[in-house]
């Protein structure tokens, strides 16, 4: 009898806890349901705050709902040293140290997906240690002009090579609980006037040259 009562009490306790757990905090629920439930609980101000930065590399959370801030860091070839809250100056922390990895141009030149996996794993470990939620990388824009000062951040002019190399990087990075943010958007292939230029190209060029690496990053890498 006592064993039955103990089991019944435990069952009731578990049921009570389950009933009290909001859908958005229940890992067993579909992600769509969790997002919908979380949004339904937020004020307009809280929703707006989630859509833009609160500092150079962080977005606000919703403390009353237990939703934490989101902390990001550059970049494709190493976690960035900490910078000030509202400007690009370095914070000069005395305990701040990171590894400067070879640029992604060098990684792509190996033609070695296993090396890319090790690269992503190592960066992911450092990002997790630094308590980052999102790493802004890898960079997979295709080389269009040699005058792009950020070409070194990308994986070359071959869409197939970039597609193959970015996937293991992302997979291993994200095993550390750090999300990959692939950059810098498809067709953002030059720095000069990058926020203003009008990109003209055919669908064939888009799908055969500039989009494959981004597609592989999302569909195969899970970014």
Predicted feature locations:
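Bacterial Sec-dependent N-terminal signal peptides
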Residues: 1-21
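Glycoside hydrolase catalytic-domain context in secreted enzymes
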Residues: 19-223
């Amino acid at each position: 009898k006592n064993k039955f009562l103990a089991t019944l009490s435990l069952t009731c306790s578990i049921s009570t806890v389950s009933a009290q757990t909001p859908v958005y905090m229940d890992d067993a629920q579909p992600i769509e349901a969790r997002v919908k439930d979380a949004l339904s609980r937020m004020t307009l101000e809280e929703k707006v705050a989630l859509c833009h930065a609160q500092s150079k590399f962080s977005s606000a959370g919703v403390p009353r709902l237990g939703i934490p801030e989101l902390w990001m860091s550059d970049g494709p070839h190493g976690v960035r040293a900490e910078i000030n809250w509202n400007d690009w100056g370095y914070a000069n922390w005395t305990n701040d140290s990171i590894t400067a990895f070879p640029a992604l141009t060098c990684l792509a030149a190996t033609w070695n997906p296993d090396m890319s996996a090790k690269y992503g794993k190592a960066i992911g470990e450092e990002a997790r240690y630094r308590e980052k939620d999102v790493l802004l990388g890898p960079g997979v824009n295709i080389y269009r002009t040699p005058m792009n000062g950020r070409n070194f951040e990308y994986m070359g002019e071959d869409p197939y090579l970039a597609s193959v190399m970015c996937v293991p990087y992302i997979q291993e990075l994200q095993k550390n609980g750090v999300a990959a943010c692939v950059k810098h958007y498809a067709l953002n292939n030059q720095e000069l006037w990058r926020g203003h230029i009008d990109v003209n190209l055919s669908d064939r060029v888009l799908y055969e040259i500039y989009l494959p690496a981004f597609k592989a990053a999302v569909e195969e890498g899970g970014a």
